[in-house]
Amino acid sequence: MMCVCIPKKKLMDWRVYYIYSYVVCLYMCGSDCACICVLACVVQCVCFNVEMRL
């Protein structure tokens, strides 16, 4: 399962962007998944089941 990532706006503070993108990824993945943004959300987020986390 993949999540769409949000492009970073030029003037957006990185902390705001991090929280914003995390919330969006979490929303798209669902509460039973976690999302890791790949390459600062340039391409996409990778979803994985929380149970598979190490």
UniProtKB/Swiss-Prot annotation:
Superkingdom of origin organism: Eukaryota
GO cellular component assignments: membrane
Membrane-crossing residue ranges in chain numbering: 21-43
Cellular localization per UniProt: Membrane
Keywords: Membrane, Transmembrane, Transmembrane helix
Topology within the bilayer: Single-pass membrane protein
Protein name, UniProt field: Uncharacterized protein YIL046W-A
Originating organism: Saccharomyces cerevisiae (strain ATCC 204508 / S288c)
